[in-house]
Amino acid sequence: MTYPGAVSQAPESSAEFVAVRAAAQRAAAAAPGVRAAGGPAVDAALRTAAGLLREKAPELLAANAADVESATANGMAGGLLDRLRITPERLSDMATQLEVLADTPEPPTERFVRDLPSGERVFERSIPVGVIGAVFEARPNVTIDVASQVLKARSAAVLRTGSAALGSATALVELVIAPALAAHGIPTDAVQLVPLPGHAGAEALVGLPDLVPLVVVRGSGEVTRKLSTLGAAAGTRVLAHADGGGVLYLDSSADDALVERLVHDSTDRLGVCNRLNLLLIDSPVYDRLLPVAEKVLRDRGITLSLPPHEHALGHEWALDSGNEAHVTVAPVDGAVEAALTAARETSGLAACVAATDETVARTFIDAYTGTGVFWNAPTRLLDGYKLLGLPETGINVDHTPGPRGPVTYPDLALRQFVILPPA
């Protein structure tokens, strides 16, 4: 029976479900080989993949150019096209990040906890999940980010990208990831790409807890929330990155130069989740600081959404196709109201306080409950590579225990207790 408001899942007989289950089965069969390969082999494969990104650059850029051309013809907005596009510089950055990840020492996978009164020794271990799924936006670099993190965590991956990036993602898997794995004796089936466009493939992926117990979901808020609901109903653990939007609070102690720098550095890209989305200004200096911020924004081609607002205060412009070049502005009465507004009106991804008064900054930091809080630093830093020196699978904004903020490979593991006889 289907109840009003219930969320339906891809039928098990559908072509999408069959294809995704087959991909998950291949990944599950490959997962023991990833675990057995060990750290040195995985790290070597990541270094080889970095080399292939550079070596195969012409083919990869050509595949991406075809995706961008098709998306442009279909009317994709500028901010989304920016996320879809691979440039030689971005390809180089992807390669560098793989090398950094390969060179990153792994944290200990086992630690001693205690001796029981009866003498047994208790240890805590981190073990691989097995197969990890990922659903992400039409953003080719995420294919590499997620695959590399999952492999570093000794698991296999099933990836589903936005349909606009399917050609780019396919090229990355076939020309870079698979050959790199094969070169070091790791099963090439360890990274699977769902070959079908449309949301049915994503819905199928979150409905296979027997094969894919953990799925990282990122992208548009509405779709991500739906997939989280479907995953919960199926028994799949979903790490969801549904909404974003950075907040910048301008305190009365902030000077013009500080405001100019933070507004500028927070808006270098408009199609990303951690960009400036909501600008809050302390009421006593609203008339003084608004023109300072406005000049920087207008120079970047960004329109200010000024009060009164017909939209929600935390409306995420990065997800509003065709309207990405907007920032919402509102006055607030002090640091506490600013922090509470940022937490209440947005996803709680990230907020920055611009202030030269340390007491004000500490007040804002203590009052804000979101994932990342910054003092005189742009929210664009809430990124796995920028913040932690590691690529990320996504940014988790849950208000529950578990990995929160940029999710990297140490977060993609299971806790296991091992009890040994007395020494």
Per-region residue spans from a language model:
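Rossmann-like NAD(P) dinucleotide-binding subdomain of oxidoreductase/dehydrogenase enzymes
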Residues: 103, 110-257
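Conserved C-terminal structural/oligomerization subdomain of aldehyde/semialdehyde dehydrogenase
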Residues: 316-423
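Short, ordered loop/turn segments at secondary-structure junctions
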Residues: 161-164, 196, 220-221, 243, ...
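ALDH superfamily catalytic-core signature
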Residues: 16-18, 55, 137-141, 145-156, ...
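N-terminal Rossmann-like NAD(P)+-binding subdomain of aldehyde/semialdehyde dehydrogenases
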Residues: 2-121, 149
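Flexible, glycine/charged-enriched surface loops at secondary-structure junctions
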Residues: 37-44, 62, 184-191, 270, ...
